[in-house]
């Protein structure tokens, strides 16, 4: 089971569960909706994963710990002050039922991490559908390196970003991407970006998430994954900042 629980203005709390096992929660922007969902599902929690320190990912930690004091909360070093109980900057996490890969994806924050659980990538604010996070550290090389790590994962990887930013990202992508495959196949055939935009507009009109996405699709529609060099990535990211 994979579920995107809307939170705050445009965040998602991701919940992942193998059948009949306790679930994993990714990021804690708030807890009221989360606790209501957990109660309704009569769910048990195995672990919480924090991708980075920003408040819109961690401000629910205190309330969560009061209700679930024994559940481990994993996160990078920068999340210790936010309430993380287990510090992980890279490597593997072994819980009772899950093996989780921790992938360094800094740049948005210095120690931002992404988590790979089975074939599900929980990438916080590092990678978005058709976009990537702002580089608040100013370290574009760190951000580029992190995205390059994610770009080595298989096509079938299910990508679970933390924000509903897809439509805005697609608008930017349409200005910078040329879909060669569509040109070669037929002048009438819509580009991958345009097709995805139509899908996302339909989803959002029905108040449904545009996510998750897949790495295969992102390789077609995401200019930041297509960037071949640090210079190209940096230029794209700076252009998106003022788009």
From Swiss-Prot:
EC number: 3.1.2.6
Record: residues binding Zn(2+) 2: 56-57, 125, 163
Keyword Hydrolase attached: yes
Top-rank lineage group of the source organism: Bacteria
Sequence positions that bind Zn(2+) 1: 52, 54, 108, 125
Example of a GO biological process term: methylglyoxal catabolic process to D-lactate via S-lactoyl-glutathione
Pathway(s) where this gene product acts: Secondary metabolite metabolism; methylglyoxal degradation; (R)-lactate from methylglyoxal: step 2/2
Broad EC category: hydrolase
Cofactor(s) required, per the database record: Zn(2+)
Cofactor-binding details, from the entry: Binds 2 Zn(2+) ions per subunit.
A Pfam entry, by short name: HAGH_C
InterPro entries reported for this sequence: Clx_II_MBL, Glyoxalase_II_hydrolase, HAGH_C, Hydroxyacylglutathione_Hdrlase, Metallo-B-lactamas, RibonucZ/Hydroxyglut_hydro
Catalytic activity: an S-(2-hydroxyacyl)glutathione + H2O = a 2-hydroxy carboxylate + glutathione + H(+)
GO MF annotations, alphabetized: hydroxyacylglutathione hydrolase activity; metal ion binding
Disulfide-linked positions: none
Keywords: Hydrolase, Metal-binding, Zinc
Coiled coil: none
Assigned protein family: Belongs to the metallo-beta-lactamase superfamily. Glyoxalase II family.
Functional summary from the UniProt entry: Thiolesterase that catalyzes the hydrolysis of S-D-lactoyl-glutathione to form glutathione and D-lactic acid.
The protein's assembly and partners: Monomer.
Protein name: Hydroxyacylglutathione hydrolase
Organism: Haemophilus influenzae (strain PittGG)
């Amino acid at each position: 089971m994979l579920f995107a629980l809307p939170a705050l203005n445009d965040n998602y709390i991701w919940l992942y569960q193998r059948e009949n096992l306790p679930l994993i929660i990714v990021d804690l922007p708030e807890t009221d909706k989360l606790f209501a969902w957990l109660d309704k599902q009569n769910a048990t929690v195995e672990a919480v994963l924090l991708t980075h320190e920003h408040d819109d990912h961690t401000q629910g930690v205190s309330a969560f710990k009061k209700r679930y004091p024994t559940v481990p909360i994993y996160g990078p070093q920068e999340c210790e002050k936010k309430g993380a109980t287990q510090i992980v900057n890279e490597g593997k996490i072994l819980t009772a039922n899950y093996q989780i890969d921790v992938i360094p994806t800094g740049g948005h924050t210095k120690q931002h991490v992404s988590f790979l659980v089975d074939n599900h990538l929980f990438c916080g604010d590092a990678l978005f559908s058709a976009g990537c996070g702002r580089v608040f550290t100013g370290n574009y090389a760190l951000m580029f390196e992190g995205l390059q790590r994610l770009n080595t994962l298989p096509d079938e990887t299910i990508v679970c970003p933390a924000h509903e930013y897809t439509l805005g990202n697609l608008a930017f992508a349409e200005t910078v991407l040329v879909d060669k495959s569509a040109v070669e196949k037929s002048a009438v055939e819509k580009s991958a970006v345009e097709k995805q935009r139509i899908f996302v507009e339909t989803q959002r009109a029905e108040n449904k998430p545009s996510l998750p996405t897949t790495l295969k699709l992102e390789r077609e529609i995401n200019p930041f994954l297509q960037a071949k060099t640090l210079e190209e990535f940096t230029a794209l990211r700076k252009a998106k900042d003022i788009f």
